Amino acid sequence: MKKRIITISREFGSGGRFIGEEVAKKLGIAYYDKNIINDIAEKSGLSPEYVQKNAELSPKKGLFAYAFAGRDITGKSVEDMVYEAQRKVILELAEKEPCVIIGRNADYILKDRDDVLNVFIHGDAPEKIQRIIRLYNVEEQKAVKMMVDIDKRRMVNYNFYTNQKWGKADNYTLCLNSSQLGYDRCEKIIMECI
C-alpha cells in the first residue's frame, strides 16, 4: 500500500523538523507540528500555552511525581488528558489528508495503519550541538544541556505512553542519521519510500 502519512520522530538538533517540513513542501502535503497545539488544547480543555509547554515532553517530573499528580474524576492526570487529546487530533489528521506529522508519538498512535511511514532522525552529537548553537544562539555548554534534557524528556514521554523504547530501530520504518547522510539525502530517501 502507498504511504500517505509520514511520521517523523527525532533527536533534538538532528534537523528532523526541518527535514519533515521540506518533505511536506516537496510532496505538496500538509505539515503538522506545533500548529496542532490549539486543536489539542481545545480537546483537552487546557490552555494552548500549557499544551505547548507540556504536550510532547510530559510526564516531565518522572514516574514518582506522575503517580502523585492531580487527577480528574476519571483518574486521569493532566498529562494523560493532554496525551489523549493529542492522540485524537493525530488520528483525525491521518483520516483527513496525506501529511507529515512531527513527533508527538504519532508513529505509535498510528501503528495500526498500513499507510504510514515511520521515520526516526538522529545525528552525531557534535553536529547536533553546532546546529543548536546556531539556531538558539547559545553557548556550547547550554547547547549540550538542551540536547540532553530535551531528548531525555522525549524518551521518558515516549517510553511511558507507548511501552516501547524511543529511538529503537524496531519501532520505525526508517532510521536516518542526518549527520552522515545530510538533510537533502534524508529527504530523498523518505520520498523514495512512499
Report each predicted region and the residues it spans:
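Conserved phosphate-donor/acceptor-positioning beta-strand/loop module used by diverse small-molecule
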Residues: 112-135, 140-150
